[in-house]
Amino acid sequence: MMRLTLKSKVLLLAMVPVLLFALVLSGGAVLILKKQADAEVKDTRERLLGDRRAELEHYVQIAMGSIQAEYDRSANGDLNARAEAIARLSKIKYGKDGYIFGYDSQVVRLFRGDSPVDVGKSFRDRRDPSGVYLNRELVEAGRNGSHYVTYTSPLPGNESVMVPKLSYTLYLPKWDMVIGSAINLDGVEAQLVEIKQDIDERIGTLIASIVGIAGVLLVVLLVIGLAVANAMLRPLHQIRQNLDDIAAGEGDLTRRLPVTSYDELGELAGSFNRFVEKIHGLVRQIAGMTGDLKQLVEQMSAQAERSEQAMERQRHETDQVATAINEMSAAAHEVAQSAQRAAEAAQQTDHEGQAAKRVVDGSIERIHALVDEIRDSGTSLDSLQQDVQSIVSVLGVIRSIAEQTNLLALNAAIEAARAGEAGRGFAVVADEVRALASRTQQSTQEIQGMIDRLQQGTNAAVDAMRRSGEAGEGTSNQANQAGDSLDAIAQLIATINAMNAQIASAAEEQTAVAEEINRSVHQIAGAVDSVADEAQQGAQTARSLAQLGQGLGRLVGQFRI
């Protein structure tokens, strides 16, 4: 498909009607002139043929006039008078080669000018080159009164050339003779050819005039069309230039088209200005929102970085808590073993106390041994009390960590709520961490209650050991009262056995609780790892948003607002 510019279309719109008008006018003029020429040629032909008919009739009438008197005086069938008339008619000549001829009703040639050729010969069955019985028609035209016959005949002196001819015949019934004459019409055709040539020249002159006028009009319309097209296309060129500037990266949205007319082009320029104004406002709003988005993304990125760091610290602290719980579990196990050994020692002491009743003499030494063992038990109980205090300290650390974890999870949930849809997964993880921290606090409180009871039992055991020591000292000084004291010692040993059983049970419970705490801490550590991974993903998402904001800022920066 041919691509034309708008200027070319405007010029074509101006020139094509003129060309069509010139073509239609030329064609109409040519058709009219052709019709007029044909009519003129026809009229001229008829006029010239009429002149030739009149001339030919005049010649024949002159010839008839030369024999009219004899014809009037003669009788029907008077061959002598006819012979005299033939002799007179054969001598008549006119023009360059004009002559008179005669045939009878049987188409027998009676004379042909002064030439004796074929005189007395019948031409009834003779045809011309066109196959027409010419001589019959000549005789028939004279007899029926039509007189005129048009035909073709070889040109005298050049038999190969056929020329049109016109004959006029007149029938003389008394003599049964048709006389007539013929003239060539080639002169008429020559005149007609000249007339046609003259008409063709006039038509050519007229067409040339029309073409010249059309050419002048085309030039004038071309100049006017160029001026109008330039005036029409100037705003369009400005619109295209502004659009090209915006598309090529210039991006100047402050430029406007001047509205210099109130036609469709002026309306187009006004519409373009309104369009650019709307885009200008949109780009300005996008630029402002891009700045706000950039600030929000930077804040979110900083918060994500802080959350990531906080979760890393919490992970480290959780590892420390797990280590402390493992140590506490080992200490509780040692306490249980010590309690078991104390129980065994108490039983042995009981046996020895029973033996002391039977063997008074060896009671002092055994009492001293018992005092030493009681002192060792007191020392072990002191160590147990110190271990319990360590467990209390560790539980305090665990409680503090749980509280800090709860606060961190709360802050993480708040930050996730601020992040909106992107922080929903992080908020779920933060809620799980808070739940785990709450459970840790509850377990810590339960352990604290157990340890309080363990401390009370330990204090009681320490007091009992102290009293046993004092009693042992008294027993060493008062060996005489050994029997009575042995009963008290037996009772005290039973109490010690019960306390040791309680200590062992408490130690076992402490071990179980420590293992439960250890599992909880490991779960917390796993949750913290998940939260840390989510925090890293949130930080990565924040960095991606920051990059998108920067890219959007660069895109908006391409426009001049």
From Swiss-Prot:
It holds the Pfam family HAMP. Residues 289-525 form the Methyl-accepting transducer domain. Keywords: Cell inner membrane, Cell membrane, Chemotaxis, Membrane, Methylation, Transducer, Transmembrane, Transmembrane helix. It comes from the Bacteria. GO terms for molecular function: transmembrane signaling receptor activity. Residues 336-348 have a biased composition (Low complexity). Belongs to the methyl-accepting chemotaxis (MCP) protein family. This is Methyl-accepting chemotaxis protein CtpM. It comes from Pseudomonas aeruginosa (strain ATCC 15692 / DSM 22644 / CIP 104116 / JCM 14847 / LMG 12228 / 1C / PRS 101 / PAO1).
